[in-house]
């Protein structure tokens, strides 16, 4: 069976695969445009995106907006297919500025999690009014429960007469910061299969009343074409994958960052407590060992990039640690990774990865349903 397309209203991706936004700097225009050109949805991560701007220290908010503009334009220049998204965490201090920048640049989709993006439609309306034209950008929250999806549908409808254009449902096997309590991470009640089904049921009445589709995307631990088939059979419209795209030639991170995935063993995948107070999934290394022994201390904070960060008490600056890792300086940083990161055994091109996933999908689909 051929993989179905993924539709967000009038926008269509040929392949129902979203490359998850990965910061700091791991998914920029290089990776995002390569994924889009294979028919998927490429996503630029916005956290600390202005890191290379020479004026970042003086103007961190402006730097992030300027570089985001540059990255979106570079991606668009290199794209011949697919859709382009940006991932903007609600927890970012400059959330509004990044959102309005992305909309003004006519990005296809804004994915937003790390909190509930309750006012996202307001920014769409503001930019549309400023430009005096209707903008094409779709708004897709990232949630971890049917309850959160229901709240957003209800709030957006009552306040803005707007329904989400889709939902990404992120489960406890994802990499990076996790929207779960530590004790929920291995609880079957919070498995991705359970919460995807929960969100599908939560959005169903809203979709029926509006007489349109609200696609639900499965994310967090999705690794093979077989996984894709499983979630499509459940009623998901597509999947989001992050870890698989790190080990590609087009990934924007340093080669040392990618090799950390290739070299990882099952026991290297661990849960850490982030300085911002959330659990996170990462790969063990000497930096994290030093943190656990209390040997790390933050440098002066250039910009409080995350609202929840207490820079006075934080054992280290997570933004700087992730930036160091992106540059390949893993002695002074670490790598966020999904639960299946240890399965990565080589670096391939994005095209090779897509071809592999399509073959796996076909094999699994026909094995399960030989008709």
Model features per residue range: what roles?
Residues 1-209:
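Active-site entrance/lid segments in N-terminal catalytic domains of soluble metabolic enzymes
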Residues 18, 174-217, 223-371:
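Conserved active-site-proximal phosphate/metal-binding subdomains
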């Amino acid at each position: 069976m051929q993989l179905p397309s993924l539709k967000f209203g009038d926008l269509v991706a040929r392949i129902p695969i979203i490359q998850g936004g990965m910061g700091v700097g791991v998914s920029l225009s290089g990776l995002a445009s390569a994924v889009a050109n294979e028919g998927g949805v490429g996503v630029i991560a916005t956290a600390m995106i202005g890191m290379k701007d020479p004026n970042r220290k003086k103007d961190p908010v402006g730097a992030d907006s300027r570089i985001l503009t540059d990255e979106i334009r570079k991606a668009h220049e290199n794209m011949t297919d697919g859709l382009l998204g940006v991932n903007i965490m609600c927890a970012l201090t400059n959330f509004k500025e990044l959102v309005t920048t992305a909309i003004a640049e006519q990005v296809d989709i804004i994915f937003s999690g790390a909190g509930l993006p309750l006012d996202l439609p307001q920014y769409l309306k503001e930019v549309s009014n400023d430009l005096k034209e209707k903008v094409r950008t779709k708004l897709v929250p990232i949630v971890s429960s049917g309850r959160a999806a229901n709240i957003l549908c209800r709030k957006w409808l009552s306040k803005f007469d707007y329904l989400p254009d889709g939902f990404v449902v992120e489960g406890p096997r994802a990499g990076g910061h996790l929207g779960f309590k530590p004790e929920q991470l291995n609880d079957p009640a919070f498995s991705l299969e359970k919460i995807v089904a929960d969100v599908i049921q939560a959005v169903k009445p809203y979709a029926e009343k509006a007489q349109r589709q609200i696609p639900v995307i499965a994310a967090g631990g999705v690794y093979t074409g077989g996984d894709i088939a499983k979630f499509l059979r459940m009623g998901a419209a597509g999947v989001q994958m992050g870890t698989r795209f790190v080990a590609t030639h087009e990934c924007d991170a340093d080669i040392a960052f990618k090799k950390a995935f290739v070299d990882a063993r099952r026991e290297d995948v661990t849960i850490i407590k982030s300085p911002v107070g959330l659990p996170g999934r990462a790969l063990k290394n000497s930096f994290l060992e030093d943190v656990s022994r209390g040997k790390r201390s933050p440098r002066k904070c250039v910009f409080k990039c995350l609202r929840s960060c207490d820079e006075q008490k934080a054992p280290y600056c997570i933004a700087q640690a992730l930036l160091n890792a992106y540059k390949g300086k893993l002695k002074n940083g670490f790598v966020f990774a999904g639960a299946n990161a240890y399965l990565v055994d080589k670096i391939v091109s994005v095209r090779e990865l897509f071809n592999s996933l399509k073959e796996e999908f076909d094999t699994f689909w026909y094995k399960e349903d030989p008709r």
